[in-house]
Amino acid sequence: MTTFLLFVLSVFSSSMSQYWQKRAAMLFAMQPDLRPLQKLFSRPLILSVFFLGVGAMTWLGVLSVWDVSMAYPLLSINFVIMLLLSHYVFNEPISVRQWIGITLIMLGVIFLAGGEQWLI
């Protein structure tokens, strides 16, 4: 598997972990009487931990090849993914300030990654 595919899988897994953490928080808010073990073994929390683990393992694969000084800033793509996901899945509004912010983030990612041979 190429390093770029590992990076994509890491970003996807990290975003999915955040998604399932939000789902877990929503479940716990809707059912405040859940006992700690019920929370610990709830489907959303288990999926969150699973995706967190996949993200960590694939990230280690990325770091074994790419310089952390270049790879880590590219993880800011997660901010963009989560903003859009929260809007379309959780119906959270996106302000003009947020649109400007994600545009700047994406410009930064393009600037950092543009034309560099380490992406291949």
Curated annotation (Swiss-Prot):
BP terms from Gene Ontology: lipid A biosynthetic process; lipopolysaccharide biosynthetic process
Membrane topology label: Multi-pass membrane protein
Chief location of this protein within or outside the cell: membrane
Keyword Transmembrane tagged: yes
Listed InterPro entries: EamA_dom (IPR000620), Flippase_ArnE (IPR022883), Small_drug/metabolite_transptr (IPR000390)
Subcellular location: Cell inner membrane
Pathway of action: Bacterial outer membrane biogenesis; lipopolysaccharide biosynthesis
Keywords: Cell inner membrane, Cell membrane, Lipid A biosynthesis, Lipid biosynthesis, Lipid metabolism, Lipopolysaccharide biosynthesis, Membrane, Transmembrane, Transmembrane helix, Transport
Membrane-crossing segments per the record: 45-65, 70-90, 100-120
Domain of life where this protein originates: Bacteria
Database matches in Gene3D superfamilies: 1.10.3730.20
Gene Ontology CC: plasma membrane
Function description: Translocates 4-amino-4-deoxy-L-arabinose-phosphoundecaprenol (alpha-L-Ara4N-phosphoundecaprenol) from the cytoplasmic to the periplasmic side of the inner membrane.
Family stated for the protein in its record: Belongs to the ArnE family.
Record's protein name: Probable 4-amino-4-deoxy-L-arabinose-phosphoundecaprenol flippase subunit ArnE
Organism: Shewanella sediminis (strain HAW-EB3)
Gene name tied to this protein: arnE
